[in-house]
Amino acid sequence: MPRIKRGVTTRQKHKRLLDQAKGYRGRRKNTIRIARQAVEKAGQYAYRDRKVKKRSFRALWIQRINAAVRAEGLTYSQFMHGVKLAGIELDRKVMADLAMNEEAAFKSVIDQAKAALPA
């Protein structure tokens, strides 16, 4: 039975790894062991930050809605309570976009939410 040599597969693995480490600084771009660690850590950061991105966008939308609503004399929590009572089914992303780009439309949403709040 012939001996199996793994030089080709090792070279392919190393090449794929170094391609992933392209653009890194120092020995992280051309030393196999260090590049492997750097690529693995980059993957961990990417996985974590895909989750963080959702949180930070939601926080941004809330800040934008809050700023627009406070100009009309409500707090964010009062506004959201009024939105729920009024049965308005717009999510925060859409409301933040309305607050930024369509002030008249968002003003009507605020008026509906105010009307739904108990006096």
From Swiss-Prot:
Cellular component per GO, a single term: ribosome
UniProt record, GO biological process: ribosomal large subunit assembly; translation
InterPro entries xref list: Ribosomal_bL20, RIBOSOMAL_L20_CS, Ribosomal_protein_bL20_C
Q: Does the keyword Transcription regulation apply?
A: no
Single GO MF annotation: rRNA binding
Q: Which Pfam families match?
A: Ribosomal_L20
Q: Which Gene3D superfamilies match?
A: 6.10.160.10, Ribosomal protein L20 (1.10.1900.20)
Going by the UniProt record, its keywords in alphabetical order are: Ribonucleoprotein, Ribosomal protein, RNA-binding, rRNA-binding
Q: Which family does the record claim for this protein?
A: Belongs to the bacterial ribosomal protein bL20 family.
Q: What does this protein do?
A: Binds directly to 23S ribosomal RNA and is necessary for the in vitro assembly process of the 50S ribosomal subunit. It is not involved in the protein synthesizing functions of that subunit.
Q: State what protein this is by name.
A: Large ribosomal subunit protein bL20
Instruction: Give the originating organism.
Output: Erythrobacter litoralis (strain HTCC2594)
